[in-house]
Amino acid sequence: ERQIEKTREVVAIAKKFAFEYFDGDRKYGYGGYNYNPKYWSQVSIDLINYYNLNNNSKVLDVGCAKGFLLYELKKNLPDLTIEGIDISDYAIQNAKKEIKKYLKVGNATDLPYADKSYDLVVSIVTLHNLKKDKLKKALAEITRVSRKDSFITLDAYSNIEEKRNMEDWNLTAETMMSKEEWRTFFIESNFHGDYYW
């Protein structure tokens, strides 16, 4: 169980995705969402290698937060075209200054980009924060703006204990499902991109 009680008030504050969620007290979320080069550097290298990204590629991060992944991608491929979108004005305003100009506030359910604009669209631990109907729309939007690949990660459980842990700890998830339920949901949503838990 959480060290601090998960009250309606705590959840409501976390779901604003503002200072309290990213950089405030741990009971509201991250407790300090800071850049960790060791983590993001490896993730960016893995994405570059797996999706064969190069300096001519275009990448969109849906739910980019402060843009740490895009920053690392740009460091590794300086001419890569990057864009990020996040629902949090706070996160965008507090993004890495080197890439802030590539980020905007917006919603995953209505991406302001043309069809087939990106070689890769990523969404890292974001989409489970939407209710199923909006989640289905976000998956359709990711598919629409991707001309080639998409990759999402989200929270999923494998057993009752993991489910209980998610229910105790996750403050912002609107959709909690088992891995098998997610797979079925992706099929029903006509999502054919890559995913990981």
Model-assigned labels for residue ranges:
Residues 1-51, 56-112, 130-137, 141, ...:
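Class I (Rossmann-like) S-adenosyl-L-methionine-dependent methyltransferase catalytic domain
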Residues 119:
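Conserved acidic residues
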Residues 122:
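A conserved beta-strand element that flanks and buttresses the S-adenosyl-L-methionine
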Residues 125-129:
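Short catalytic micro-motifs in class I SAM-dependent methyltransferases
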